[in-house]
Amino acid sequence: MSAKEGSSHPSYAEIVREHAPEQTAAEKAAPQPPEVEEVLSEEPYQKNEKVVVLDEEDADAFLHPEEAEAKKESEKPSDGEKKGKTEKLEKEAKSVYSKACNFVNAHKVPASAAISINLLSLGAISAYLLKSRQSGTLNNRTLCTCTAIAGIVFTISAVFSKTPKTACCASKKSNKST
């Protein structure tokens, strides 16, 4: 039986030894693998340990704080440079935002098409649920899935249906004209 006291079941290694075929000469000549002992870590187990992944610059700053501080001080811009950078970033953000508004508005469909899509999808979901109910396969999972699909369809149609220009897009266009 096993080497452990009180164990009524043989170990996996013992079962393999009992049912293994005879070893060949080459197998007998091969060195035996080292015995593995169970070693428990002496450090306490940390269940909710969080790992933080740093990018290369942050990792360098963490490993070499003196160099990072010297680099930061040498890179400090003057007030004029700060103002220029801020204006440049604001201008770039405005152009990106206006491009995003134009892209979204260009790919929208008329409200009548969105309503038709909603009705069509709602009808298909209702037909599926009715068929499931009649066949006796309707369950909570099916209901939840169909509810989620309906919510997704309605959300997508709301996003991609034409509506009056939003205040933020209109304000951006009025800022361009001034």
From Swiss-Prot:
It comes from the Eukaryota. Residues 44-53, 61-89 have a biased composition (Basic and acidic residues). GO terms for cellular component: cytosol; mitochondrial outer membrane; mitochondrion; nucleus. Residues 1-89 are annotated as: Disordered. GO terms for biological process: protein targeting to mitochondrion. This is Uncharacterized protein C11C11.06c. It comes from Schizosaccharomyces pombe (strain 972 / ATCC 24843).
